[in-house]
Amino acid sequence: MFIGKGIEIERRAFLRRSGQLAMMGAASSYALDLAGLAEAAAFNGGGGYKALVCVFLYGGNDHGNTLIPFDQANYARYAAIRGTAGSEDASGIALGRSALANTVLATPSDQRLTDDITYALAPTMPRLKTLFDSGAMAPLLNVGPLIAPLTRAQYDAGSVPRPAKLFSHNDQQSTWQSSQPEGSRTGWGGRMGDLALSSNTNAMFTAINATGNAVFLSGQTAVPYQVSPAGATLYNPLQNGRLFNSAAASQALSTLLRSGSGNVMAADYARFNDRSIQYGAFVNDALRSVTLCTSFGTGNRLADQLRVVAQLIAARGRLGVTRQVFLVSLGGFDHHDGLIGSHDALLGQVDSAVDAFYRATVELGVADNVTTFTASDFGRTLSSNGDGSDHGWGAHHFIVGGGVRGGRFYGRAPQVSVNSADQVGQGRLLPTTSVDELSATLGLWFGVAPSELPSVAPNIGRFASADIGFMKPAQTAVAATR
């Protein structure tokens, strides 16, 4: 069933006229900008399937208690800065060294990290340790938004541009997801989707959002298709009285629709709504055809999202796609206090969900063709503010998949310090790897032509390399035939 073009024409007409609602109901620019559709640029789609899955950890994950120094010397520095949990003044947030023994990541013999540091994962992440040991997971050290390479001296002098509004949740979420300032209308996942549209029979299913609204999947042409753990999310803006997240816009639309059957807006809306229902039925029928044996457990919001992503990948043949970008998320990571315990539990959810998803890709025969990576607003201070940590900048993240050169570290390990040249105060890491370098490396694997990388990663020309090296060379992917 080909349904990738018709709804776009109706979407354009409907949203063009919904400019009336912007004046009457203050509909968001994000929603209205979905109208700007264009032809996809040339893309190296190859002959098989590939997908990228972004796991966004909202709130700013505390990387210091996610990937922890384990060797004696660096652990001692870490514990001295963070304080021992359970100390008399209750100011400690350092994890106990003995609790890390089962999650130590062995540094490859041909790698030497800064100060000979050895890392361990949080105790609640044993499954990611197993993936690292098997070569399916790689940590990317001290990555964050940068406009250009930046040293501490340049930061202090203000001689090199830096991202705007550092340490701010909304601004840095947008900057991470778009490689542009807060207010950007496209994200780098959506811009990859723009390039990949021509590879898919049904272009609507190129970018799929299994969580709330985010700029990451919005392109100039690509429009995020919304799903929930239960399947397709039907478009019915009047059901809850909030069109484009605006009650006034919803009321304005209701008034227009009641104005008579000859109203052109009403006709557009009716056609658009009918198409949305067709899409929902089509997606849900495709999902019902899927048999997935991998267990994702219960009571894990992230696992629920990744389960439906796995089901959609299993249905890729019926959906008519060979390239897809997905977004899932988990919130609750803004630990200004109560870090010990709460943070461990959240990391346990990430560990369980990402592992289950990887095992599902193995079951489906696409482990080499699906790459999952974590992201977050920012890292956090290495120093404790009592029983938590404050907003930072650079952080450590994970890349998972059969196409990953796992079992080794990428990027540059920072010193365990609050006054070294690779931090900007209180142990806030100054990134040594940019988000643009991360997105460019993923983009090359995904099929983005080198000449098109600046459209995905706008700052990449300022950095030494567009390929950090954590992905294996592109190979013929598994064909999307099932």
Give the residues covered by each predicted segment.
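Feature for exported/extracytoplasmic and membrane-associated proteins, marking the mature portion
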Residues: M1-S352, A356-E363, S383, I399, ...
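Active-site lining segments that contact anionic ligands and/or coordinate catalytic metals
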Residues: R323-V325, A367-N369, A375, G392-A395, ...
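Metal-dependent active-site segment of extracytoplasmic phospho-/sulfohydrolases and closely related
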Residues: A360-G386
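Histidine-centered active-site microenvironments of extracellular/periplasmic hydrolases
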Residues: S376-F409
